[in-house]
């Protein structure tokens, strides 16, 4: 039984257990100038982290726009803070490859 987007109820015998339900979040960000060159030493580490996030069920998709100026991603997580922590822990953020990141709660219509 769904209580709302943030909480779900599961009935076990006569006990009701509340647990957090993952929500979806969209990421928009901006790459630094000359990102293709600057990212080279960090790319494998970055991709390994993204693969782990996918295996953990957090990252749905992430990648650059065709002109490599913007980054777009979709996450499924318990909170916006969790997504922001993942992004700020990414080597692309720490090394200045990503220079701007914005995360928004997202409701998928279809």
Regions found by a protein language model. Name each.
Residues 1-8:
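N-terminal chloroplast transit peptides
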């Amino acid at each position: 039984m769904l209580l709302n987007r943030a909480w779900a109820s599961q009935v076990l015998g006569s006990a009701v257990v509340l647990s957090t339900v993952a929500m979806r979040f969209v990421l928009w960000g901006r790459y630094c100038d000359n990102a293709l060159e600057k990212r080279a030493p960090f790319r494998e580490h970055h991709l390994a982290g993204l693969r782990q996030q996918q295996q953990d069920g957090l990252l749905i998709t992430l990648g650059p726009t065709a002109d490599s100026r913007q980054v777009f991603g979709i996450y499924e997580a318990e909170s916006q803070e969790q997504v922001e922590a993942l992004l700020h822990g990414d080597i692309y953020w720490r090394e200045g490859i990503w220079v701007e990141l914005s995360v928004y709660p997202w409701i998928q219509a279809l």
